[in-house]
């Protein structure tokens, strides 16, 4: 609904991204200390979570970072030289939140990177991988999820 969307944008505007990364760091510490885990970690995020995954891949000791239609990555490129592990970023061709100019800027910034892969999905919009969402695109979601799972398998095993 429009009310829910407006509330979501209000909360988004108030969100402290660095505190979000700190929360992820705390979660990762707990996972690494838990004897029932392998100690390997990855961060996967969608929308704002895509930005958090990007920043986690830059600032934290993780084995992989994956972002779907991450908003605001272009404003945080000063961290890109800190990437030490594989990162995959998925974008939608028709995404007004991550427009063509932004995707081009990201492609230019990561074109020579062996660690960062960018994937653009033609004819798709923001939220294309969210099952049940208005912009859900089954084919693109399956392709992006297959790519994501392959990176996770390679990085975490």
Locations of the language-model features?
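N-terminal cap/leader regions of alpha/beta-hydrolase-fold enzymes
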Residues: 1-157
């Amino acid at each position: 609904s429009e009310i829910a969307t407006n509330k979501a944008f209000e909360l988004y505007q108030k969100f402290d991204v660095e505190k979000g990364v700190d929360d992820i760091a705390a979660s990762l510490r707990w996972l690494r200390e838990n004897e029932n885990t392998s100690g390997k970690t990855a961060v996967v995020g969608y929308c704002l979570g895509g930005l958090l995954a990007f920043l986690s891949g830059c600032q934290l000791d993780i084995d992989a970072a994956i972002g779907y239609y991450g908003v605001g990555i272009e404003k945080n490129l000063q961290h890109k030289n800190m990437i030490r592990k594989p990162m995959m970023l998925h974008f939608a061709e028709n995404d007004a939140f991550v427009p063509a100019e932004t995707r081009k800027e990201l492609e230019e910034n990561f074109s020579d990177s062996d660690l960062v892969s960018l994937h653009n999905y033609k004819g798709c919009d923001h939220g294309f991988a969210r099952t049940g969402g208005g912009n859900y695109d089954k084919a693109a979601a399956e392709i992006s999820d297959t790519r994501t799972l392959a990176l996770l398998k390679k990085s975490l095993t």
